UniProtKB/Swiss-Prot annotation:
Domain of life of the organism encoding this protein: Archaea
Name of this chain's protein: Transcription factor E
GO molecular function: DNA binding
Oligomeric form and interacting partners: Monomer. Interaction with RNA polymerase subunits RpoF and RpoE is necessary for Tfe stimulatory transcription activity. Able to interact with Tbp and RNA polymerase in the absence of DNA promoter. Interacts both with the preinitiation and elongation complexes.
Annotated source species: Methanopyrus kandleri (strain AV19 / DSM 6324 / JCM 9639 / NBRC 100938)
Name of the encoding gene: tfe
Family classification: Belongs to the TFE family.
GO biological process, one term: regulation of DNA-templated transcription
Length: 188
C-alpha cells in the first residue's frame, strides 16, 4: 500500500497498530498481527483476509472492528458479483496510527521527564517494607522518621539506579518520537 516504506518502517507501523490492541480481551494476538500485516500492504475484504490466513472470518472481523473503534482503519461497503451480499473493504489509516502513537509517546515522555524533575530531584525515605509508601523529606519529618504504617525507621532511598533507568527510558522515547515523526513526514 505504501511502496516508499521499507520493511523496518512497516514493522514499526505494525507494532504501533498492534499496541492499540494490547488491552483487548477476546482478540487473538496472532490473528491480529497477521490481519494488520495484510491491511498494511493493501486494502482487503475481511473474508479474503480470513481465507488467506486460514482462520474464521469472525476472528478477523473482531480485530478490524476493534481497530475501527480506535479510528485507525476505515472501510467502504461495496457489492461484488462473487458475493450475494454487500462486503466491506478495509484499509489501515497510517497517518492516524502515527498521530495516536506520537500523542501517546509524547505523553509518556512528559510523565518520565516530570518524574525526573520532581520526584527524583528530592530525597525520598522508606522503611524497606514493600507494603509501605515512600515519603518526601517533609513527610518523613512530620512522622519523626518513622513509617506511619508499620512503625519502622525511615531510611533515605538511593535513587541513582531509578534515575538512570528513567533517563534511559526518556532517551528511548525521544528516539522513538523522532523516528515516528520522520515516518509521518515521509507519508505526507
Amino acid at each position: 500500500m505504501y511502496a516508499e516504506l521499507g520493511e523496518e518502517d512497516l514493522e514499526v507501523l505494525r507494532d504501533v497498530t498492534l499496541s492499540l490492541l494490547d488491552s483487548e480481551k477476546g482478540v487473538d494476538p496472532e490473528v491480529a498481527k497477521r490481519t494488520v500485516d495484510v491491511i498494511l500492504k493493501r486494502e482487503a475484504i475481511d473474508e479474503e483476509i480470513a481465507e488467506e490466513l486460514g482462520v474464521d472470518p469472525r476472528e478477523v472481523r473482531k480485530v478490524l472492528y476493534k481497530l475501527h473503534e480506535r479510528g485507525v482503519v476505515t472501510f467502504r461497503k461495496e457489492r461484488r458479483e462473487e458475493y450475494r451480499y454487500p462486503v466491506y473493504s478495509w484499509r489501515l489509516n497510517l497517518r492516524e496510527v502515527l498521530r495516536r502513537c506520537l500523542e501517546e509517546r509524547r505523553r509518556e515522555l512528559e510523565e518520565v521527564e516530570r518524574a525526573l524533575s520532581n520526584d527524583m530531584s528530592h530525597p525520598m525515605f522508606h522503611c524497606g517494607n514493600d507494603d509501605c509508601p515512600r515519603m518526601s523529606f517533609e513527610e518523613a519529618m512530620e512522622h519523626e522518621f518513622r513509617c506511619p504504617k508499620c512503625g519502622e525507621v525511615l531510611e533515605e532511598v538511593d535513587l541513582t539506579e531509578e534515575r538512570r533507568e528513567l533517563e534511559r527510558l526518556a532517551e528511548e522515547l525521544k528516539v522513538e518520537i523522532r523516528r515516528l515523526e520522520e515516518l509521518r513526514e515521509r507519508l505526507g
